[in-house]
């Protein structure tokens, strides 16, 4: 049976739509992180008070992810993508308008919820588009997210340099979201021809999904460690200048983005199991060797290799989790993403606590060891047989 040209038009548009949403997600988060110091200054917050506000954001994200799983499976990504994206852009503005810490915490809780909702909704939509595309394309979506994060950070930095307030910065980004999200929503993939309620799915557990979440947890411990500790390691442990120390996280981010840009081709060539196995080994050897050498240049290279190694792991795990039972993809991805987010938050804290006992260089071996664990457990990404009632293809 041959496909008509029209059969490929909507998947292409749907892929572009999801790419745009991943990009917006990255822009929102990148802009927010660069303007956190302005929020702190405007409200005269101590480090501890700011931490409470950021904890509210993290709690909201977990709540949003958990709620999104069931909402997506019940109502579908088609209905949820646009309102969730618009809400996330709108609530980005709210922290900049908060008059005190209590209101700030409430705003960040709400912002975290919509951010978690958008995370799960767009990742589930990506799995749906990949299923319709019939080829590995998940890494490309995450590459666009990385690009969006860079753009958002650049926008936030330029606005800060120009003396614009955080509120003006966030309003600008919210306006961009309000323009682009409806355009993307017009091209989103149509819902499946088989309604979830008629498939008989949704009963019993999701075999293996929790373990897949553990793999993403391990991966995001490495991402969090690079974000929070790479520059500190180069500056405090290796004695590099602050400017050169910042190159460690820059190398990590650039190599992660580059890895995701070629991730789909690598997936098609190697398959998810071998790709994740080789990726885990690359991440572990790169960081581990750099820690053994103990030189600033080696440190930058090591964190770059860590980024390259971790780049394709999470997209492959999301693809595997979302493909096990398409009718419950939202719940599966929510479980995996929640565990991953927990790793991103808890991992750096654990490394910091351990560094007090054994030193930062030794504590930073944790991400390397976890990357080796992911490599050893890569066989868990072998595809399971789809649920018989949900094996129908996505219609376009």
Segments and roles (model prediction):
Residues 34-48, 228-244:
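Short amphipathic helix-loop junctions that connect adjacent transmembrane helices
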Residues 63-77, 160, 259-272, 355-356:
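Helix-to-loop junctions at the C-terminal end of transmembrane segments
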Residues 44, 76, 97-102, 239, ...:
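Helix-breaking motifs and short loop linkers at transmembrane-helix boundaries and internal kinks
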Residues 141-189:
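Helix-loop-helix hairpin linking two adjacent transmembrane segments in secondary transporters
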Residues 8-35, 41, 109, 206-222, ...:
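Pair of pore-lining "gating" transmembrane helices in MFS-fold secondary transporters
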Residues 63-102:
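Conserved MFS/SLC helix-loop-helix module at the cytosolic interface between two early adjacent transmembrane helices
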Residues 117-131, 312-325:
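Intracellular juxtamembrane helix-capping segments at the cytosolic ends
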Residues 39-40, 71-72, 158-163, 234-235, ...:
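Interfacial helix-cap and linker-helix signal at transmembrane-aqueous boundaries
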């Amino acid at each position: 049976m041959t496909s008509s040209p029209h059969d490929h038009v909507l998947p292409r548009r749907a892929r572009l739509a999801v790419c745009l949403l991943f990009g917006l997600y990255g822009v929102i988060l990148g802009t927010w992180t660069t303007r956190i110091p302005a929020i702190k200054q405007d409200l005269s917050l101590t480090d501890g008070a700011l931490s409470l506000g950021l904890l509210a954001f993290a709690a909201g994200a977990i709540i949003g992810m958990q709620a999104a799983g069931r909402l997506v499976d019940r109502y579908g990504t088609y209905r949820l993508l646009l309102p969730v994206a618009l809400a996330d852009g709108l609530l980005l503005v709210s922290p900049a308008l908060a008059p005190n810490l209590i209101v700030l915490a409430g705003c960040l809780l709400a912002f975290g919820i919509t951010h978690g909702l958008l995370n799960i909704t767009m990742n589930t939509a990506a799995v749906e588009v990949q299923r319709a595309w019939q080829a590995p394309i998940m890494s490309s979506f995450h590459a666009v997210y990385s690009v969006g994060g860079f753009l958002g950070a650049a926008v936030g930095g330029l606005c800060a340099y120009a003396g614009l307030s955080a509120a003006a910065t966030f309003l600008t980004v919210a306006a961009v979201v309000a323009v682009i999200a409806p355009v993307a929503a017009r091209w989103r993939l149509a819902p499946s021809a088989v309604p979830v309620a008629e498939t008989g799915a949704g009963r019993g557990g999701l075999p293996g999904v929790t373990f897949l979440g553990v793999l993403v947890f391990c991966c995001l411990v490495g991402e969090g460690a690079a974000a929070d500790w790479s520059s500190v390691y180069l500056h405090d442990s290796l004695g590099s200048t602050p400017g050169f120390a910042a190159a460690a996280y820059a190398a990590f981010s650039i190599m992660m983005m580059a890895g995701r840009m070629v991730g789909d081709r690598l997936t098609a060539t190697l398959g998810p199991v071998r790709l994740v196995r080789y990726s885990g080994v690359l991440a572990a050897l790169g960081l581990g060797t750099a820690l053994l050498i103990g030189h600033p240049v080696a440190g930058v290279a090591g964190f770059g290799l860590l980024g390259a190694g971790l780049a394709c792991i999470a997209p492959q795990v999301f693809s595997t989790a979302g493909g096990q039972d398409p009718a419950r993809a939202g719940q599966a991805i929510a479980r995996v993403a929640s565990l991953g987010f927990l790793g991103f938050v808890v991992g750096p804290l654990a490394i910091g606590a351990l560094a007090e006992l054994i030193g930062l260089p030794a504590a930073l071996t944790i991400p390397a060891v976890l990357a080796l664990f992911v490599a050893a457990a890569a066989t868990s990404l072998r595809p399971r047989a789809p649920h018989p009632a949900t094996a129908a293809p996505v219609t376009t």
